[in-house]
């Protein structure tokens, strides 16, 4: 095993490109250790790149339009930060359900998002979060997560609640550790206005082995139903969910969506 401490985020990204598949960014390492054959023995063929020694990745700030959260921020520090509580309360709710305190104190937001299946992923995807990359450019999180080789992410930008009027947003996690069962499904739902009902324009979901993504077929179904003022059935919603989720998870997702849209009464 090799561990390198690059001088800057740009140098880290350049090294990762040079090493190719052998490269692996590491921060808290809480997720990486779960994939190792021996939890305390890192794979010898992997070249780890430490990303936890640059101040710019470990701070939270307010810009004119966005809340900036450094990718190297510890999960528990993000959860407790007053600006995050003010501008991203649903992210705080998701973080409160994420693992044990020891995990939250060690793991980072960048690691959770980079994994693509973490609790924070649906929330940030549903809020149209942006990512700051090492070249200084901004990219939508949706676009970043589609890349096979995900770049090093410096920070995440979320809309400020005192600049952009917040839209109704909820987070759902089915089967979490408080019930001593592994999480089966993580979802975030966002409505276009305070009336809620069928005005659901963002449905983001992730599950073990299934990267976070939007359920666009379901979004289109609800938009069509809202336009025509018709009531979609639970079976209609489940069928659209099955376009990207296995049947058992599609059943769970469809009931959550229908319930939040007032379609189960």
Annotated model-derived regions:
Residues 1-265:
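C-terminal structural segment of proteins
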């Amino acid at each position: 095993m090799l561990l390198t401490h690059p001088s800057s985020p740009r140098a880290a990204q350049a090294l990762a490109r040079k090493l190719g598949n052998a490269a692996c960014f590491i921060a808290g390492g809480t997720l990486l250790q779960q994939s190792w054959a021996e939890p305390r023995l890192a794979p010898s063929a992997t070249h780890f790149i430490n990303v936890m020694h640059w101040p710019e990745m470990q701070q939270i700030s307010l810009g004119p339009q966005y809340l900036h959260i450094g990718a190297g921020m510890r999960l528990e520090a993000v959860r407790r930060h007053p600006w995050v509580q003010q501008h991203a309360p649903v992210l705080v709710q998701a973080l409160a359900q994420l693992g044990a305190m020891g995990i939250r104190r060690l793991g980072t937001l960048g690691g959770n998002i980079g994994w693509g299946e973490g609790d924070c992923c649906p929330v940030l995807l549903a809020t149209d979060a942006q990512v700051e990359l090492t070249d200084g450019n901004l990219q939508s999180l949706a676009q970043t997560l589609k890349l096979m080789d995900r770049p090093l992410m410096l920070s995440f930008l979320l809309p400020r609640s005192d600049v952009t009027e917040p839209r109704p947003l909820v987070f759902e996690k089915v089967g979490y550790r408080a019930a001593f069962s592994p999480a089966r499904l993580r979802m975030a739902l966002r409505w276009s206005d305070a009336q809620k009902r069928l005005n659901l324009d963002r449905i983001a979901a992730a599950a073990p082995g299934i990267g976070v993504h939007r359920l666009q077929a379901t979004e289109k179904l609800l938009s069509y139903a809202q336009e025509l003022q018709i009531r979609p059935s639970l079976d209609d919603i489940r069928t659209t969910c099955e376009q990207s989720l296995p049947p058992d998870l599609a059943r769970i997702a469809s009931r959550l969506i229908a319930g939040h849209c007032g379609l189960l009464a």
